[in-house]
């Protein structure tokens, strides 16, 4: 094991030294093929950085001035000029010039520029300029991407005009496509969509933000999340109740068109339903002068954490009247799908349209209402 480690360490040192050779060692002529064990043990010897090849195969590592076809390396490949075609390495591909083809490496790809290239690596891809496609298990970085970046953890680019998909986060200055991340998307300007499991952050969004928890932006008309912190948007706190006296303290936040809703509260009709939680999304239908009209989709869950449970999902129409000083009085009808256990059925205070007992649970479709008061922050 120690011998293998020492051999890999020596190979790594050789790669670093070869990569650091002076820039005057550029390709002088074109060769049909290049075969070797590792630099300089090859058919071209120490002059290999001065040759462009159409076909190269190296058992461990190889160095050339350029490649125009297929280049295969057991561990590492170094190209001091441009690369066209396909590069395949067990560990690392290093291209100093422009990549116009495909790099495939077990660990790491890097290219000076890659305007018409594709980089696929087990860990990391690095490139300057525009790289159409980067796929890695860990991290992608390029100055500009106009097609696809896919990474297990992080994508970063100055400008993205395509799709970024990352398990952890996408980070770009300007996005004109789609950002999809498991946790975080971050951009300065977005002309497209941000979709994340947790947080989206941007300054200006001309599109849609969809997050599992929070959207943050200076300007965003269509943020879809439970909490939306939009600088030029709206934030409201309110107190409301429904036909079952489920009374909630709520926080509504979002842009000029779409907002999110989160709330906590209790039920005054059924004391055992002591703890209530609510979440939803709202659409602004009308907002002018002293009157506004919202349409909300919501889910309400009540429990005592000891077996008593009640849930209600539905839509509600909420006209609101502005009373002055940011105060609004709202109230309107709702269409609710209610669910509870048979032996703990909590009857609706509204009008039951349909009900059924099935598999030990009771479900019903009801007409209800919501009334309350809220304050614009």
Regions found by a protein language model. Name each.
Residues 77-79, 93-95, 109-111, 125-127, ...:
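Sequence/structural signature of outer-membrane beta-barrel proteins
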Residues 98-100, 114-115, 130-131, 145-146, ...:
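Repeated loop/turn-to-beta-strand initiation elements of outer-membrane beta-barrel proteins
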Residues 57, 212, 226, 247-253, ...:
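Residues on the lipid-exposed face of transmembrane beta-strands in outer-membrane beta-barrel proteins
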């Amino acid at each position: 094991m120690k011998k293998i480690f020492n051999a890999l360490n020596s190979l790594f040192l050789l790669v670093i030294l070869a990569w650091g050779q002076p820039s005057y060692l550029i390709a002088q002529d074109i060769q049909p093929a290049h075969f070797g064990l590792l630099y300089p043990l090859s058919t071209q010897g120490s002059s290999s950085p001065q040759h462009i090849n159409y076909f190269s195969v190296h058992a461990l590592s190889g160095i050339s001035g350029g490649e125009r076809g297929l280049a295969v390396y057991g561990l590492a490949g170094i190209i001091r000029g441009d690369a066209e075609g396909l590069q395949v390495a067990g560990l690392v591909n290093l291209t100093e010039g422009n990549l116009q083809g495909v790099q495939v490496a077990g660990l790491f790809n890097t290219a000076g520029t890659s305007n018409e290239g594709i980089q696929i690596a087990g860990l990391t891809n690095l490139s300057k300029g525009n790289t159409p496609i980067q796929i890695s298990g860990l991290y992608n970085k390029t100055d500009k991407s106009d097609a696809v970046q896919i990474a297990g953890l992080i994508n970063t680019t100055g400008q993205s005009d395509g799709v970024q998909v990352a398990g952890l986060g996408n980070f770009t200055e300007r996005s004109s496509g789609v950002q999809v991340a498991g946790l975080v998307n971050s951009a300065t300007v977005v002309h497209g969509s941000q979709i994340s499991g947790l947080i989206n952050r941007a300054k200006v969004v001309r599109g849609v933000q969809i997050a599992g928890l929070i959207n943050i932006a200076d300007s965003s008309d269509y943020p879809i999340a439970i909490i939306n912190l939009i600088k030029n948007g709206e934030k409201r706190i309110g107190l409301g109740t429904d036909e079952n006296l489920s009374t909630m303290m709520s926080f509504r936040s979002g842009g000029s068109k779409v907002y999110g809703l989160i709330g906590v509260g209790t039920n005054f009709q059924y004391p055992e339903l002591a703890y209530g939680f609510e979440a939803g999304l709202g659409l602004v239908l009308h907002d002018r002068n002293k009157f506004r009209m919202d349409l909300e989709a919501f889910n309400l869950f009540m429990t005592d954490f000891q077996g008593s449970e009640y849930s209600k999902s539905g839509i509600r129409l909420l006209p609101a009247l502005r009373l002055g000083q940011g105060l609004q009085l709202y109230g309107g009808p709702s269409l609710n799908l209610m669910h509870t256990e048979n032996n703990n059925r909590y009857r609706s205070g509204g009008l039951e349209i349909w009900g059924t007992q099935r598999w030990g649970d009771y479900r019903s479709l009801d007409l209800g209402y919501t009334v309350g008061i809220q304050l614009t922050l």
